[in-house]
């Protein structure tokens, strides 16, 4: 809290007055970061796109976000602080991973309903897609075993995941 107050140019009392506790500060930080990915996956931006283009857009935004230094730092904080603040982990999961999965599953459900892709379980298909995107990349980045991926590296990984996904769940 001292560092945050110093960087913000305010007193520690001001930080506590605004957030109430370290847990609330972490929760606000997590919520702000999670909103960024949710906004980038806004459903209206996906409608009207061919399925391959929509999945590519989702994949690039998701992987870029997930592997960004800010997201990695927040993830590390959440993992390290959740034993002391269990609600932080729950709030992080609800605002981030669960929300993102829900948005993607709803997109896939609508696309399947319009006959644009063949699948019968949008939630399971979403898990498959995200699993192909994440693979070992996230853990390796969190552990510092791999440098940041370039835009070209992200694009190649996403294109491969989309190709594999559309083999499992073809478009007509």
PLM region spans:
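Amphipathic alpha-helical packing segments from all-alpha helical-bundle domains
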Residues: 53, 64-65, 69-73, 77-79, ...
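Amphipathic alpha-helical linker/stalk segments
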Residues: 27-58, 64-66, 70, 109
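Residue-level preference for short helical/loop micro-motifs built around acidic side chains
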Residues: 3, 23-28, 36, 53, ...
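C-terminal peripheral helix-coil segments that are non-catalytic and often amphipathic
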Residues: 53, 57, 61, 102, ...
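Helix-loop "lid/cap" segments that line or gate small-molecule binding pockets
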Residues: 45, 60-67, 74-83, 164, ...
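Helix-turn-helix
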Residues: 1-24, 28-32
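Hydrophobic/aromatic residues within well-ordered alpha-helical segments
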Residues: 22, 29, 33, 55-58, ...
